[in-house]
UniProtKB/Swiss-Prot annotation:
<dbReference type="InterPro" id="IPR047084">
    <property type="entry name" value="GFAT_N"/>
</dbReference>
<dbReference type="GO" id="GO:0004360">
    <property type="term" value="F:glutamine-fructose-6-phosphate transaminase (isomerizing) activity"/>
</dbReference>
<keyword id="KW-0315">Glutamine amidotransferase</keyword>
<dbReference type="GO" id="GO:0097367">
    <property type="term" value="F:carbohydrate derivative binding"/>
</dbReference>
<dbReference type="GO" id="GO:0005975">
    <property type="term" value="P:carbohydrate metabolic process"/>
</dbReference>
<dbReference type="InterPro" id="IPR046348">
    <property type="entry name" value="SIS_dom_sf"/>
</dbReference>
<dbReference type="InterPro" id="IPR017932">
    <property type="entry name" value="GATase_2_dom"/>
</dbReference>
<comment type="function">
    <text>Catalyzes the first step in hexosamine metabolism, converting fructose-6P into glucosamine-6P using glutamine as a nitrogen source.</text>
</comment>
<feature type="domain" description="SIS 1">
    <location>
        <begin position="285"/>
        <end position="426"/>
    </location>
</feature>
<dbReference type="InterPro" id="IPR029055">
    <property type="entry name" value="Ntn_hydrolases_N"/>
</dbReference>
<dbReference type="InterPro" id="IPR001347">
    <property type="entry name" value="SIS_dom"/>
</dbReference>
<dbReference type="InterPro" id="IPR005855">
    <property type="entry name" value="GFAT"/>
</dbReference>
<dbReference type="Pfam" id="PF13522">
    <property type="entry name" value="GATase_6"/>
</dbReference>
<keyword id="KW-0032">Aminotransferase</keyword>
<comment type="subunit">
    <text>Homodimer.</text>
</comment>
<dbReference type="InterPro" id="IPR035466">
    <property type="entry name" value="GlmS/AgaS_SIS"/>
</dbReference>
<keyword id="KW-0677">Repeat</keyword>
C-alpha cells in the first residue's frame, strides 16, 4: 500500500513529485524518497517519516533533471528505516526503482542473485526488481527487453517505476495486480498510483492493465506493451474530480470534514437515484438482469465487509433472496458454493483492494452469472473488471478511516434492496412511498444529528479506558462492528462488537466493575431485547452508554449515559447510527491526542494481500 509518483518533462520535477507524494500519503507514510538522473548520475534522497520530512531535505528544489520518481512507503518487507525506504538502487548505482506491492517469490530470487555475487543493501522484496533489471541490462544493453524479462520473473503484485542513469529522458513503469496510472500533459507525463495525485496538471490519463508496462520517453507518447512484447493501444480517459481534496474547509482534520460532508453526499445520491415521491428511478440498474438472480454473494474487506453484512440483513428482510457475505481474503481459498444464477457484488472504496480483486478473478473463473461493483473510483480495476458498477459519488476521501464513502455504500446497498423488492413485487405501493420518504429525510436528519454536542463531549471522561464493548442487534449489529473498528483504527483502543444476545455465551465474562459498554438501540424490532441485554451487563456493574432514538427517554433507567439520535425510518437508521460511531471515535482519538488522519500501521488503499 505504497504511493508511487513519477514525472518526465520540462518543469521542476522534484517539486512536482514532492507535491504528488503528499497527495498519496493516504497509501502509506512510514518513509519517503525520490530519485532523479542529474548529469548522468543518480541523485537519491530518502528519509524515515512523512513526505514533509523528505521535502525538508531540499533547501533548493530546483534540480536540473527531466525524470524524477518518488515513493511514500507503508512497510510490508523490512522495518521502516532509511535503508529500506525507496528508491532502491542496484550495486553499481546505475538504476533506481520505486515499487508498490509484494513479490511473493522474492526469497527464491534473492537466493539466486546472491549466488551470482550480488549484494543486497536492504531487507525489502522491492530491491529484487532493480538488481534483476541491472543484471539483464548488463547482458543485453536493451531497456525494453531487460524490463520485460525482469517483470516475467516476478510473482505477486507489482506496480513500479524505474530510471537508468544512461537514459535520463526515459522512465519505465509497470502494473501487475497493482494500480498505476499515466497522466498525459503537454510535453510531459506523470506516473502515479492514483490519478488524483496529478489532477492539478492534467485530466487525461491511461490506466495500465495488469500485465502491462510502459516506456515513457520525453517528447513522445508512452508506449505500452504486454509481457509478450506486443504493443498495446490504450484509450485516453478523462479524469473527473469534483473537489480540491487538499482543502479541509476550516476543519482541523480531514476525517472531521468528511464526517460533515455526509449530508451533502447522501443528498446527491438520493437526487440521482430517487424521484420526488421517493421511488427508486427506473434507470437505476436498468441494464442489469436483476430479476433473474436466485441468490447473492457479497465479497469485501474491512469496513466494506460491514456494509455488505448490513446489506445481507436489509435485502433478506425485503425480498426472499438468500444473501451470502464473504471476507475477500478468505473467499478465494475456501471454494464456497456459487450457483449458476448468482449475483456477485464486490465492494471496495478504492476499487483496488487486492483481496477483493483476487475474489473478482475467482468469481470470473467460477463463471458467476453477473458481477456488480460498488466503489468510488471510476478508473479503478474493480470498476473496469465488473459487468456494472455503482459509484459512491462521495468525492475524494483522504482520512484513512472511512466515513462518507462507507455511508454512501450503505445507501446504495439499501437502494439495491429496494430495487430487488420492487422487481419481485415484494412491496406495496404504500410501503414503497414510506420507505422512500424515510430515506429522503436522511440528509436533514444527519444535519440534526451532527449538531448534537454530546457526540463530542462523551469521550474525555473515558479517555483513560483501554477496552470497550459494543452491543447491537439485527441492523445495529453491523453498525456496532463498524463503530468498534473506528475506535480501534484511530484511538488505538481494544474494542469488540457483539450481537446483544451473544453476551451470555461468553463475552459477559469480560465485564467487571466500570467496564464501558456502548449499546446501540436503534432497531425497534429488537429494542426490548436490547434493554434486557443492557440490564445483564448493568447487573455486573458495567458502565452503560446507550445510543437510542430521542423518543426513548425511558432508556435512562437502564443506562448511565445516553446519546440520543433523531427518530427515523428503519432503513435510515443504519446510516445515522453509523455516523454516531464515527463521531464518537473521532472525539475519543482527539481526547487522547492521536494522529487522526494518518493512524499508525494503516493505509487507505490496501493494494497488497
Amino acid at each position: 500500500m505504497c504511493g508511487i509518483f513519477g514525472y518526465l518533462g520540462n518543469q521542476d520535477g522534484v517539486s512536482i513529485v514532492l507535491e504528488g507524494l503528499a497527495k498519496l500519503e493516504y497509501r502509506g507514510y512510514d518513509s519517503a524518497g525520490l530519485a532523479a538522473v542529474v548529469e548522468q548520475e543518480l541523485f537519491i534522497r530518502k528519509t524515515v517519516g512523512r513526505v514533509q520530512e523528505l521535502s525538508n531535505l531540499f533547501q533548493e528544489r530546483e534540480i536540473p533533471t527531466a525524470s524524477v520518481i518518488g515513493h511514500t512507503r507503508w512497510a510490508t518487507h523490512g522495518v521502516p528505516t532509511e535503508i529500506n525506504a525507496h528508491p532502491h538502487v542496484d550495486e553499481g548505482r546505475s538504476c533506481a526503482v520505486v515499487h508498490n506491492g509484494i513479490i511473493e517469490n522474492f526469497k527464491e530470487l534473492r537466493r539466486e542473485l546472491t549466488a551470482q555475487g550480488i549484494s543486497f543493501a536492504s531487507d525489502t522484496d522491492s530491491e529484487i526488481i532493480v538488481q534483476l533489471f541491472s543484471l539483464y541490462y548488463q547482458e543485453s544493453q536493451d531497456l525494453v527487453f531487460s524490463f520485460c524479462q525482469t517483470l516475467a520473473q516476478l510473482r505477486g503484485s507489482v506496480a513500479c517505476a524505474l530510471i537508468h542513469k544512461d537514459h535520463p529522458h526515459t522512465i519505465l513503469c509497470a502494473s501487475q495486480e497493482s494500480p498505476l496510472i499515466l497522466g498525459l500533459g503537454k510535453e510531459e507525463t506523470f506516473i502515479a498510483s492514483d490519478s488524483r495525485a496529478f489532477f492539478k496538471y492534467t485530466r487525461h490519463s491511461q490506466a495500465l492493465a495488469s500485465g502491462e508496462f510502459a516506456i515513457v520517453s520525453q517528447g513522445k507518447e508512452p508506449e505500452v506493451y504486454n509481457l509478450e512484447l506486443k504493443k498495446i493501444h490504450k484509450d485516453v480517459r478523462q479524469i473527473t474530480c469534483s473537489e480540491d481534496a487538499s482543502d479541509k474547509s476550516g476543519y482541523g482534520y480531514y476525517m472531521l470534514k468528511e464526517i460533515y460532508d455526509q449530508p451533502e453526499v447522501l443528498e446527491g445520491l438520493i437526487q440521482k437515484h430517487m424521484d420526488e415521491e421517493g421511488h427508486i428511478l427506473s434507470e437505476f440498474l436498468s441494464d442489469v438482469p436483476i430479476k433473474s438472480f436466485k441468490e447473492i454473494t457479497i465479497v469485501a474487506c474491512g469496513s466494506s465487509y460491514h456494509a455488505g453484512y448490513l446489506a445481507k440483513y436489509i435485502i433478506e428482510s425485503l425480498v426472499s433472496i438468500p444473501v451470502h457475505i464473504e471476507v475477500a481474503s478468505e473467499f478465494r481459498y475456501r471454494r464456497p458454493y456459487i450457483g449458476k444464477d448468482t449475483l456477485g457484488i464486490l465492494i471496495s472504496q478504492s476499487g483496488e483492494t487486492a483481496d477483493t480483486l483476487a475474489a473478482l478473478k475467482e468469481l470470473r473463473r467460477r463463471n458467476i452469472a453477473y458481477l456488480l461493483g460498488i466503489c468510488n473510483v471510476p478508473e479503478s480495476a474493480i470498476a473496469l473488471g465488473v459487468d456494472h458498477c455503482l459509484f459512491l459519488e462521495a468525492g475524494v476521501e483522504i482520512g484513512v478511516a472511512t466515513t462518507k464513502a462507507f455511508t454512501s455504500q450503505l445507501l446504495l446497498l439499501v437502494f439495491l434492496g429496494l430495487k430487488l423488492a420492487n422487481v419481485h413485487g415484494a412491496l406495496t405501493h404504500a410501503e414503497q412511498c414510506s420507505f422512500g420518504q424515510g430515506l429522503q429525510s436522511l440528509p436533514d436528519l444527519c444535519q440534526k444529528l451532527l449538531a448534537n454536542e454530546s457526540l463530542h463531549s462523551w469521550a474525555q471522561p473515558y479517555s483513560y479506558e483501554d477496552k470497550f464493548l459494543f452491543l447491537g442487534r439485527r441492523l445495529m449489529y453491523p453498525v456496532v462492528m463498524e463503530a468498534a473498528l473506528k475506535l480501534k483504527e484511530i484511538a488505538y483502543i481494544e474494542a469488540n462488537a457483539y450481537p446483544g444476545g451473544e453476551m451470555k455465551h461468553g463475552p459477559i465474562a469480560l465485564i467487571s466493575k466500570g467496564t464501558p459498554v456502548i449499546a446501540f438501540c436503534g432497531d425497534d424490532i429488537v429494542y426490548e431485547k436490547m434493554i434486557g441485554n443492557m440490564m445483564e451487563v448493568k447487573a455486573r456493574h458495567a458502565h452503560v452508554i446507550a445510543i437510542a432514538p430521542e423518543s426513548r427517554e425511558d432508556i435512562a433507567a437502564v443506562s448511565d449515559q445516553q446519546i440520543f439520535v433523531p427518530d427515523c425510518h428503519f432503513l435510515a437508521a443504519p446510516v445515522l447510527y453509523t455516523i454516531v460511531g464515527q463521531v464518537m471515535a473521532y472525539a475519543m482519538a482527539l481526547a487522547k491526542g492521536m494522529e487522526i488522519d494518518c493512524p499508525r500501521n494503516l493505509a487507505k488503499s490496501v493494494t497488497v494481500e
